[in-house]
Amino acid sequence: MHQTKQQRESLYKVGQRIRIIHMEGEDTRYDGKEGVIEHIDGIGQLHGTWGSLAVIPEADKFIVIG
């Protein structure tokens, strides 16, 4: 199921802390990283303090931890 940016913004908020379990199509360097959501872009990808790659909610595995 694809979510709209508005639906994602109701689920995920700037300032929330997440832990990445696995980013689809990437190696394991981001697995286990934690960070704070700093921005949700126009297509709903999450950007934050965990590194330079955006988290894609439909593809990547992560949990909100705070």
Where are these regions (language model features)?
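Basic/aromatic-rich interaction segments and small domains that mediate binding to polyanionic partners
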Residues: 2-5, 13-66
